[in-house]
Amino acid sequence: MLKQVDRLDRVFQALADPSRRVMVERLTRGPASVSELGKPLDMSLPAVVQHLQVLEASGLIKTEKVGRVRTCSIEPKTLRQAEQWISDRRTTWEIRLDRLGEYLAVTPDEPKIKRRKR
């Protein structure tokens, strides 16, 4: 369980950065080279590589070098695990809020106490 929590921490930490989210969004449409991923972000190649290293360490992407070109692709399994974690939390809160709504629907309203004006 602890390994799963550590993995999720790394995933959410990686996704906390807007530039990395742009890269992940782009990779959901298919593999891309490092330079392709950096173009819309207007950042240096070393900065792009640094962001990609964080994404790769989190398990969100994988990279493959063929010749001089490093190609990145998304790891759908990791995204599904993060999505499942969020979905589980959402389900828990939906159940709690439904129960609260049911309770409030059957609970009579308390009379309002009138206060004297000073």
Task: Please tell me what each predicted stretch does.
Residues 14-19:
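Short helix-coil-helix linker/hinge
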Residues 9-13:
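Conserved N-terminal beta-strand and adjoining loop/helix that marks the start
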Residues 1-7, 26-45, 54-62, 77-118:
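C-terminal regulatory/oligomerization modules of transcriptional regulators
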Residues 21-23:
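Pre-recognition alpha-helix immediately N-terminal to the DNA-recognition helix
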Residues 65-71:
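Short, Lys/Arg-rich nucleic-acid/phosphate-binding segment
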